[in-house]
């Protein structure tokens, strides 16, 4: 077999078990480290309650939801749980480079009891297309100086300091 035939470049996540994986973290962990080709993870509509981490060795991945309104990644940590502090409250943490999110919702649905990050970014060249980010305080943390982020056609909801951090981020055609 050639290398092209051996690699799997499309994975499917479904809550009902009809796809390759039942949760998104398992699909991310199945991606080979430091790939030079793109893997697309298709995520079917559903609510995925998980604390998703995309590590630094995962790159060139697209996470594509079935719809922004009905493909939901959610968690409910907040800064006042076990003295967690702001930066460990994320629902999704992206440390890998060249990662794209499309047509999905990332939310931190913690009660308004303190900081509760929905998206924590540390990777470079991250793109978010037609996504929704829902939270209260500190919804999006752009965590790495020099990193470049693009948000296009996104909806971002929060109450206090809901976008913060040192990265360079461009928000085009977004509703805040």
Task: Tell me the role of every PLM-derived stretch.
Residues 1-5:
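Bacterial Sec-dependent N-terminal signal peptides
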Residues 85, 98-176:
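Right-handed parallel beta-helix
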Residues 22-33, 48-57, 63, 73, ...:
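Short, T/G/N/S-enriched strand-turn elements that build extracellular solenoid repeat scaffolds
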Residues 15-17, 40, 59-115:
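Right-handed parallel beta-helix/beta-spiral solenoid domain characteristic of secreted/periplasmic
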Residues 8-42:
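Acidic Gly/Asp/Thr-rich repetitive segments characteristic of extracellular carbohydrate-active
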Residues 16, 44-46, 131, 154:
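Active-site-proximal beta-strand/loop segments in catalytic clefts of secreted hydrolases
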